[in-house]
Amino acid sequence: MNMNRLMRTLEQDEGYRQFPYKCTAGYLSCAIGRNLQTVGIRYSEARFMLKNDIEDCVTDLRKLLENFDDLPAMIQEVLVNMRFQLGPGGIRGFKQMLG
């Protein structure tokens, strides 16, 4: 079996959707035909997504705070946690803290 060819075919057949949708069978699905109601998301997949989300938070904070990389690790982690929980708009509400 050629995994790459099969993946290309399934992606062509299913398409890619960034946000959840109802498939033709009525199930909540996302990505490339992932049935969220019967398959869900594996823990390893959730960890992979979390890592990507954290990297996005760090990128955003580096734009917001020019000295982000110079801050102590614990402060960086608190800021990333805040950015993750509050979203990009929410953390920008802390104007005095962000200076």
Task: Describe every region a protein language model picked out.
Residues 1-78, 84-85, 89-96:
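Acidic, aromatic-lined catalytic clefts of primarily extracellular/periplasmic carbohydrate-active enzymes
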